[in-house]
Amino acid sequence: VHVDAVARYLYHIREGGMAMRYGVAIAKGNLYEPGTYTIKVKKKWPTWTPTPAMIEREPYKYAQYEEGMNAGPSNPLGSRALYLFDGNRDTFLRIHGSPSPKSIGGRASSGCVRMVMAHINGLYDQVTVGATAHLHPTEDTITASA
């Protein structure tokens, strides 16, 4: 999985080199964290809890969810989530669905990569636990190499 932060696309490279391309939203401002991560957990209809940093940054928006939010259509993680780890450390970064499809193509999240529900549902079924996710820097573009 590769996220082109400049073009706002996620590429899923399949066996044989065929790639699927999906539009995404990335994190606002300096909250985007480029790097290479491992997808160690996949969840259908995940619950969501804002991180302490999110609550501190925007308490008026997130403090009410400090104890978490159940799965459902208004949950910020949507219908599926892929959990990104750095080694054995949960980064709290996710590739997930979004109940806000209009955000796709922009910078909208607090760190995660957002997809429309239909796209994350399909990607979820195709990506295995242990797969690598590359979140490319916002100032770079992905180029093909021979």
Each language-model region and where it sits:
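Short leucine-rich amphipathic alpha-helices used at interfaces
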Residues: 90-91, 97-98, 135, 141-142
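Short loop/turn segments at secondary-structure transitions that flank enzyme active sites
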Residues: 30, 45, 101, 139-141
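Gly/Pro-biased beta-strand-loop elements
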Residues: 1-94, 124, 146
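Immediate flanking context of iron-sulfur cluster ligation sites
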Residues: 95-107
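A short beta-strand motif that forms part of the nucleic acid-binding face
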Residues: 26, 97-99, 127, 139
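N-terminal targeting pre-sequences for secretion and organelle import
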Residues: 113-146
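A short pocket-lining beta-strand/turn micro-motif at the edge of beta-sheets
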Residues: 78-80, 91, 108-111, 119, ...
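Short, loop-centered acidic/histidine patches that primarily coordinate divalent metals
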Residues: 85-87, 98-100, 118, 138
